[in-house]
């Protein structure tokens, strides 16, 4: 009996020892499945990677939704601005036809439209385009050598928007850029042989002050300085002795109305006043 028992005990002892060593390198699961440490590490890493991917996907979706929402808001704002533009355009045209004060006639909504136009850079783009259009026209014709071919430039631009502190930096920058562009236009036309005539709304009593101001801004060698828009006699005298090739003005009343220039071409420059809404077009 002991002879048979001894080998059997050795076998059971070997099985027990082998089982203990295998359990040392495996994780036991109640279902009876076993997982090595390497497989467990891979499984955990996969879960972490999947979680990171899901978070990244959620962030991407959130960003896309926010972008779409912002785009929709921008479209709605543009539509509202277009509607406001049409509304202000009618009121502005009515004010000009009846020689009314636009500052008192137009609502603050129109003021906001004009301010947005300046802030978004539309004003300067339109100004530069108009100046280039004028230069292109004057380059197609050649003034005669008798110094009788003149170009009239309106040098006034009454700024009704300076009170708004929020837009002040945009307005000041627009004014600065405009002064540079207009002076360049003036110098270019003068170099082509045109006699330059400057037009101001200021009263005759401010002529000397106006001359000094023009010189300080870089203007020189003009042939005439017409003062006071209420007195058209200076304009009539100019037309009797000169050929007005073109008139470049900031305001409609300078180009039409009582002035009624006998000019070959009129150019309306965008200005920094309420009547700009006539030229406003959201792009």
From Swiss-Prot:
GO cellular component, one term: membrane
Keywords of this entry: Membrane, Transmembrane, Transmembrane helix
Pfam families registered for this protein in UniProt: Acid_phosphat_B
Keyword Translocase tagged: no
Main location: membrane
Spans through the membrane: 41-61
Region (Disordered): 1-21
Domain of life: Eukaryota
Localization per record: Membrane
InterPro entries membership: Acid_phosphat_B-like, HAD_sf
Membrane topology, as annotated: Single-pass membrane protein
PANTHER family noted in UniProt: ACID PHOSPHATASE (PTHR31284:SF22), ACID PHOSPHATASE-LIKE PROTEIN (PTHR31284)
Family to which the UniProt record says this protein belongs: Belongs to the APS1/VSP family.
Protein name, entry field: Uncharacterized protein At2g39920
């Amino acid at each position: 009996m002991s002879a048979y028992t001894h080998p059997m005990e050795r076998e059971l002892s070997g099985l027990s020892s082998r089982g203990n060593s295998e359990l040392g390198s495996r994780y036991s699961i109640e279902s009876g499945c076993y997982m090595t440490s390497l497989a467990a590490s891979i499984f955990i890493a996969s879960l972490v990677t999947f979680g990171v991917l899901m978070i990244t996907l959620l962030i991407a979706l959130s960003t896309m939704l926010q972008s779409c929402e912002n785009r929709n808001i921008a479209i709605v704002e543009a539509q509202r601005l277009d509607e406001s533009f049409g509304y202000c355009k009618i009121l502005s045209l009515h004010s000009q036809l009846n020689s009314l004060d636009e500052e008192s006639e137009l609502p603050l909504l129109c003021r906001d439209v004009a301010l947005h136009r300046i802030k978004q850079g539309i004003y300067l783009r339109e100004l530069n385009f108009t100046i280039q259009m004028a230069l292109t026209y004057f380059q197609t014709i050649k003034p005669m050598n008798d110094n009788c071919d003149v170009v009239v430039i309106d040098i006034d631009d009454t700024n009704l928007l300076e009170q708004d502190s929020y837009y002040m930096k945009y307005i000041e920058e627009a004014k600065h850029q405009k002064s540079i562009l207009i002076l360049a236009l003036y110098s270019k036309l003068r170099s082509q042989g045109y006699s330059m005539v400057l037009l101001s709304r200021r009263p005759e009593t401010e002529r000397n002050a106006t001359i000094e101001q023009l010189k300080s801004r870089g203007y020189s060698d003009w042939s005439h300085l017409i003062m006071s828009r209420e007195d058209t006699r200076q304009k009539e005298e100019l037309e009797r002795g000169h050929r007005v090739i073109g008139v470049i003005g900031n305001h409609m009343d300078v180009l039409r109305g009582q002035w009624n220039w006998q000019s070959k071409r009129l150019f309306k420059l965008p200005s920094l006043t309420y009547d700009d809404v006539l030229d406003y077009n959201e792009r």
